[in-house]
């Protein structure tokens, strides 16, 4: 049975009538054109589908859209429109952290969440903050350095 689900998406109030058990990632990508939310593992393990739900980082591939009713969601599209998001994205580009690019939206979300809660993280804190996100291209060192660069720039 379909239900009307209302939530804030990247600062804009939206609603959709759909099956509340549909995966949130599918609604974001298919109904709201948030193509930066990537699907990797479909099990909540790789972090490619990371979003901010009420300011907390979550994996949207394992959350039913019904759980988003009345909540605030920020995707990479919303983060990239903020000053902090632009600083992080620029630091990733300048630091050479982007190769294939598939994991980067999730990595940027993780970095945004980390730096919002800890503006001057240690290397161990950065690695812990990124631990829910998988990258098979860079080996993480360039990503960690890019997070440091973003923190230094005020991200």
Predicted feature locations:
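Signature of N-terminal electron-transfer/Fe-S-associated modules in redox systems
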Residues: 1-155
């Amino acid at each position: 049975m379909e239900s009307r689900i209302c939530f804030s998406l990247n600062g804009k109030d939206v609603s959709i009538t759909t099956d509340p058990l549909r995966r949130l990632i599918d609604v974001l990508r298919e109904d709201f054109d948030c193509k930066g939310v990537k699907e990797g593992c479909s099990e909540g393990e790789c972090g490619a589908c990371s979003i901010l739900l009420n300011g907390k980082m979550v994996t949207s591939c394992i959350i039913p859209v019904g759980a988003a009713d009345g909540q605030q969601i920020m995707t990479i599209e919303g983060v990239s429109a903020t000053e902090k998001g632009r600083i992080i994205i620029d630091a990733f580009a300048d630091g050479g952290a982007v190769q294939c690019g598939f994991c980067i939206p999730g990595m940027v979300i993780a970095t945004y969440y980390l730096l919002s809660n800890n503006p001057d993280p240690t290397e161990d804190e950065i690695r812990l903050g990124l631990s829910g996100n998988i990258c098979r291209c860079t080996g993480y060192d360039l990503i960690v350095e890019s997070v440091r660069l973003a923190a230094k720039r005020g991200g």
